[in-house]
């Protein structure tokens, strides 16, 4: 029977996991088995976090647009509807940036959207 020799492969695999676990406290950065569990958990959290980030930013943009548009007396939903009807194709990220950084332009956009074409 042939002897299985995988010292290099196993060492590289363990070293890679321990490298990813650098900065964790206690055994989580030193012991392979515990570190492996923590790295798997961390990678799972980072994957989920990347998906949640998109939701969180969209919520933020919507709340900023809503706050700025209510100063002008228009709700968010009616504003977006009027933008769609008047074919103003600005996404929520751009609208939020305009609302925060340049209020006068944002108010002009609202007036343009309100006025019947």
UniProtKB/Swiss-Prot annotation:
Q: Name one GO biological process term.
A: translation
- In which compartments does the protein localize? Plastid, Chloroplast
Any one Gene Ontology cellular component term annotated for this protein: ribonucleoprotein complex
Pfam families reported in the protein's UniProt record? Ribosomal_L20
Q: Which Gene3D superfamilies match?
A: 6.10.160.10, Ribosomal protein L20
Keywords of the record, alphabetical order, are: Chloroplast, Plastid, Ribonucleoprotein, Ribosomal protein, RNA-binding, rRNA-binding
As one GO molecular function, the record gives:
structural constituent of ribosome
Q: Principal place where this protein is found?
A: plastid
Biological role stated in the UniProt entry: Binds directly to 23S ribosomal RNA and is necessary for the in vitro assembly process of the 50S ribosomal subunit. It is not involved in the protein synthesizing functions of that subunit.
The family classification in the record reads: Belongs to the bacterial ribosomal protein bL20 family.
Query: What name goes with this protein?
Result: Large ribosomal subunit protein bL20c
Specify the species.
Answer: Thalassiosira pseudonana (Marine diatom)
């Amino acid at each position: 029977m042939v002897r299985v020799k995988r010292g290099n492969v196993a060492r590289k695999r363990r070293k890679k996991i321990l490298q990813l676990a650098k900065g964790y406290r206690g055994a989580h950065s030193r012991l392979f088995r515990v570190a492996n569990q923590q790295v798997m958990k961390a990678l799972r959290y980072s994957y989920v976090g990347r998906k949640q980030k998109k939701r969180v930013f969209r919520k933020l943009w919507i709340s900023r647009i809503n706050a700025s548009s209510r100063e002008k007396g228009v709700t968010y939903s009616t504003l977006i509807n009027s933008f769609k009807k008047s074919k103003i194709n600005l996404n929520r990220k751009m609208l939020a940036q305009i609302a925060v950084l340049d209020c006068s332009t944002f108010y002009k956009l609202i007036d343009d959207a309100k006025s019947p074409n």
